Amino acid sequence: MRGVMIGGTGMTRFGKYPDASIRSLVQEALHEALGDARIGPAEVETVFFGNAAAGLLTGQEMITGQVALRDSGLLGKPIINVENACASASSAAHLAWLSVASGQAEVALAIGAEKMTHADKSVPFRALIAAMDLEEIRAETGSDDPLTAGSAPGRSGFMDIYAERPGALPAV
């Protein structure tokens, strides 16, 4: 493996952007990152696009990165979509690092984008529920719906499934 450096970074300010699309949020961060690296899209060899919930919130499945990057000058290059729940962007960054470290690419781009707001507040909540082990919930509760499966007062379905012993979760 060879040494790798991060040549540039960019970020859209965290916040709620009800009228913005993932594409518009990505364009802002991408423009900043490429400018910081002092390169253009032509110099990028491969892209790793991290996103977990776009399909559930917008209906856009399978080609989320390709759609978000349509106007970026990156189409025609490999755009690999990475879905790994809350670690999607971190996983994309790891894969970009590995691509350069292994010699597969000289310049790789990692992008993470998520928009967890929706006019119907139950939609992002359902997206978070989809990140739970639904098969395990069914086996333990007999319910197909984690919202109605029930938890003890002061607890959540996440605690029932993922906290293996009392006190396993730190006090907040």
Which residue ranges define each predicted feature?
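Conserved catalytic cysteine-centered active-site region
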Residues: M1-M5, Y17, A54-V107, H118-D120, ...
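Buried hydrophobic positions in well-ordered alpha/beta secondary-structure cores of metabolic enzymes
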Residues: G7, A33, V44-V47, A89, ...
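Short beta-strand segments
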Residues: G7-G8, A108-E114
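Short polar catalytic/cofactor-binding loops
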Residues: T9-F14
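Metallocofactor- and cofactor-centric catalytic cores in central/energy metabolism, strongly enriched
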Residues: A20, S24-Q27, E43-F49, G55, ...
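Short catalytic helix/loop segments, enriched in acidic residues and glycine
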Residues: A20-A37, A68-G73
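Phosphate/pyrophosphate-binding loops at sites that engage ATP/ADP/AMP, CoA/4′-phosphopantetheine
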Residues: H31-E45, L169-V172
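Conserved residues at the C-terminal ends of beta-strands
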Residues: G50, E83, I111
